[in-house]
């Protein structure tokens, strides 16, 4: 029964991705290449391995994330991974310590603003967001209008549980981010990410 459920989740996600490319127009996938990003990357690669994948390099990521990004892109045959970086990081954060005094400003400078600029030429974007991740996402739809933008957000994994994601990774033998084994359930920038003690 679990394999059948996972099969239906996979096929459903693939259909959502296909519909996004067919109906929305110019669509990019956004990926952090984090703890479980490889699941959605695999599904997108199955549909179109030449599709644009936006990867925001905040220049504060773990070396392991950069290595994992290159490894996964190669493994899945992704040919259009676009590395996005902040243009003004050195100007606004010359010492690289903004995260210590104002983490929100650092995220805005290094992640949010560069991503929004990169997305400005797209009609929609594919995310890995799931309903189980927070209360505000409990009613997450597969397709949703982005706030204050004409873009459409596409959430092919909205119905997937954490267990579904893990089982899919095991069944398909997808490589895990190396920091997961070191106690990092979620992986972002090195200064702001800590392992969870069991």
Describe each region flagged by the PLM:
Residues 1-198:
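Nucleotide-activated chemistry modules centered on ATP-dependent adenylation/adenylyltransferase
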């Amino acid at each position: 029964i679990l394999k059948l459920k996972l099969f239906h989740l996979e096929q459903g996600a693939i259909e959502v991705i296909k519909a996004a490319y067919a109906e929305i127009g110019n669509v990019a996938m956004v990926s952090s290449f984090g703890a479980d990003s490889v699941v959605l990357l695999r599904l997108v690669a199955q549909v179109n391995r030449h599709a644009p994948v936006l990867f925001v390099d905040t220049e504060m990521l773990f070396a392991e994330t950069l290595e994992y990004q290159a490894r996964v892109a190669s493994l899945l045959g992704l040919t259009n991974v676009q590395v996005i970086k902040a243009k003004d990081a050195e100007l606004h954060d010359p010492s690289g310590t903004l995260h210590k005094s104002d983490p929100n400003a650092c995220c805005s400078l290094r992640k949010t603003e560069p991503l929004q600029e990169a997305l400005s030429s797209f009609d929609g974007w594919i995310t890995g967001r799931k309903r189980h991740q927070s209360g505000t996402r409990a009613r997450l739809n597969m397709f949703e209008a982005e706030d204050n933008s004409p873009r459409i957000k596409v959430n092919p994994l909205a119905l997937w549980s954490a267990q579904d994601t893990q089982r899919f990774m095991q069944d398909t033998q997808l490589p895990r981010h190396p920091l997961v084994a070191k106690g990092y359930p979620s992986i972002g920038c090195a200064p702001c990410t800590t392992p969870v003690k069991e």
